Amino acid sequence: MTRGVLAVACLIGAAAIAHAQQRPDVSGNWMLNGGKTTFAEWHLTDAGDRRFKAYDYKKDDPALKCIGTSWTRVWLNPNVLVKVTQNPTDVRLQYEWMDIDRRIPLVDPTAARLKRSLPIPNMPGLGTSVAWYDGDALVIETRDIEPGYVSTMQEWAGLPQSRMMRTIERLSLANPNLLSIQITHVDPANYRDPLQVTITYPRSKFELMHYGCDPKDAQITEPNK
């Protein structure tokens, strides 16, 4: 090997190492129990306000049919694990709730064409996603979302989403044992400005389990307002 080729090889290797070091390590098992959830103040359009007020938890909650309606709704579920695995070409997020298995390609977000994830079976509200790293955060961008609800829980139940919805999740470590998930929902059909949600997940020693949702076992529960 010539000195020039060796120098180039060393530079490429050093760049690869530096790039790898820039990737935050958010892998592991995480659970919402003990974490916090914060919804920033939302500003609905007239159409969004009508949809929000028309929500009927007795019949409109997709979870009654074992369907996750948005990534915020999926992250909001307590007492269930999320396992994050970082691979060289993709990231995998396994949600115990509804047994959702999410495999997202890692991409260059500036590229003209991006390879997106496959849709989650029977969950059109979850769209398709791509992921990349930005400083200390894993960023996940989702679009191709069907109309539904950002949340069906607590005072946020019925916050709507349209086909115009674009979701950005930023996963980073608040500390070595606390995962911060910052979610931005951009949906001009329903919101006058982006809806911001922050959820924190403590690290968990539990292992992933099978959820096995069955609509026949669904229980209708009135959201806490």
Predicted regions and their residues:
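N-terminal secretory signal peptides that target proteins for export/translocation
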Residues: 1-2
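PEST-like low-complexity, intrinsically disordered acidic/proline/serine-rich tracts
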Residues: 20-225
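Bacterial N-terminal signal peptides
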Residues: 5-15
